[in-house]
Amino acid sequence: MEKLTILLLVAAVLMSTQAQNQEQRQQAKINFLSKRKPSAERWRRDCTSWFGRCTVNSECCSNSCDQTYCELYAFPSFGA
């Protein structure tokens, strides 16, 4: 009878430890995924959208600034 009691206690401790580890892994996964941003969201926030104020090309999402506003598209220049 004592062996059965000890065996049940050991099993209960192992199950408790396993459940706790599972909860920690799930929480770590939730934390990791909540910190990530979709690339589209990151892209929108890191640059100025079309017709926003700018001074250099790198400020615009289109990478095209006419020294005042962001252009919709970086038009190729045809040598004049």
UniProtKB/Swiss-Prot annotation:
Record bears the keyword Chloroplast: no
GO molecular function: ion channel inhibitor activity; toxin activity
PTM sites of type 4-carboxyglutamate: 59, 71
Annotated disulfide bonds: 47-61, 54-65, 60-70
Highest taxon above the source species: Eukaryota
Keyword Disulfide bond among record annotations: yes
Propeptide stretch(es), residue numbers: 20-43, 78-80
One of the record's GO cellular component terms: extracellular region
UniProt xrefs under InterPro entries: Conotoxin
Coiled coil ranges: none
Tissue distribution: Expressed by the venom duct.
Compartments in which it is found: Secreted
4-hydroxyproline modifications at: 76
Signal peptide feature range: 1-19
Keywords: Cleavage on pair of basic residues, Disulfide bond, Gamma-carboxyglutamic acid, Hydroxylation, Ion channel impairing toxin, Knottin, Neurotoxin, Secreted, Signal, Toxin
Similarity remark: Belongs to the conotoxin O2 superfamily.
Written domain comment of the UniProt record: The presence of a 'disulfide through disulfide knot' structurally defines this protein as a knottin. The cysteine framework is VI/VII (C-C-CC-C-C).
Functional description taken from the UniProt entry: Gamma-conotoxins may act on voltage-gated non-specific cation pacemaker channels (HCN). Triggers depolarization and firing of action potential bursts in the caudodorsal neurons of lymnaea. This effect is due to activation or enhancement of a slow inward cation current that may underlie endogenous bursting activity of these neurons.
Listed name of the protein: Gamma-conotoxin PnVIIA
Protein species of origin: Conus pennaceus
